[in-house]
Amino acid sequence: MRQFPSIRGNINEKMMTTMVESQTRSPWRTPVPYLFGGLAAMLGLIAFALLLLACSYWRLSRQTEDEEKQTESGEKVVAKAFEEKILVIMAGQNNPTFLATPVAAKICLDCVNMEKKEGQNGESKVTEENH
């Protein structure tokens, strides 16, 4: 009869080499460290945003307390007036055709007062009254 070579010897050698390879394998080949690293970075970013919100709220509440103390002590609080800046760009064919800025409307209380009064038939009449 014919004799076959020993299979057990080859299997043991292969198992030993795979065990050695798995032990020397880099842990960064799996996605788990990247997953936890990304999760930690996201939680850090959220914590930083919450810290910024808490600090801004604290600063805002401190400013309102200072204003309340000034009004209680009788000091005159000067309101800060900021000019609203609005810019409107009207579209053109190639370039904007013009720029527009808002103009404050001047209302005169002594001017002519226009009032609508309904007539008997439901028609509206415009009357002018001078004050």
From Swiss-Prot:
Topological region Cytoplasmic: 56-131
Residues on Extracellular side: 1-34
Expression (tissue specificity): Expressed in the vascular tissues. Also detected in guard cells.
Localization per Swiss-Prot or TrEMBL: Membrane
Biological process according to GO: amino acid transport; regulation of amino acid export
Keyword Transmembrane assigned: yes
Keyword field: Amino-acid transport, Membrane, Transmembrane, Transmembrane helix, Transport
InterPro entries: GDU
Sequence motif: VIMAG, positions: 88-92
Membrane topology: Single-pass membrane protein
Main location group: membrane
Stretches that traverse the bilayer: 35-55
One of the record's GO cellular component terms: membrane
The keyword Transmembrane helix is annotated on this UniProt entry: yes
Superkingdom as given in the UniProt entry: Eukaryota
Note on domains (UniProt): The VIMAG motif is necessary for the function of the protein.
Function, as annotated: Probable subunit of an amino acid transporter involved in the regulation of the amino acid metabolism. Stimulates amino acid export by activating nonselective amino acid facilitators.
Note from the entry: Overexpression of GLUTAMINE DUMPER 5 leads to free amino acid levels accumulation and plant size decrease.
Similarity-based family: Belongs to the GLUTAMINE DUMPER 1 (TC 9.B.60) family.
Protein name: Protein GLUTAMINE DUMPER 5
Native source organism of the sequence: Arabidopsis thaliana
